[in-house]
Amino acid sequence: MNGNVLFEIKDLQKKFGSLTVFDGLSETICKGDVVVIIGPSGGGKSTFIRCLNLLEQPTAGKIYFEGEDITAKGFDVNRHRQKVGMVFQQFNLFNNLTVLENITISLTKVKKQSEEESKEKALKLLKRVGLEDKANAYPFQLSGGQKQRIAIVRALAMEPDVLLFDEPTSALDPEMV
């Protein structure tokens, strides 16, 4: 296997009951690749990327990440998710937390960073996307594009090796493109 290979997908299948979402899907994704999955609604695009982050378990086939079989029994899913970040279609921000808390919670709980270090990192990233003034706002006070940028910042704060986006153009702010 090439040392630059991040994902190797072999003969992947996903079924929901009698509905086959995809079957025989094989692909190799290398470090530095930008991959876009295009297809009709209901075609399995979201399901596929959810399989890459193990939010969905494939029905059959194998997924290797950095040479390790992530579909194997006993695989450490939490360790994998620290390396493979995801920005969800609905952004999945915690409505009861401020923007700053949405970003820092995983840094303090998962990465065990101090509150101060987490806050500093979050504010730096918020500044990069032009939302430092929204640090104390709640998700309901934000536009769709702002929520999307917060979700991206939250994912980037974890410093993943790979970042998966579900419907990345769904809430683009024209002024940010």
Locate the predicted segments by residue.
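ABC family nucleotide-binding domain
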Residues: N4-V177
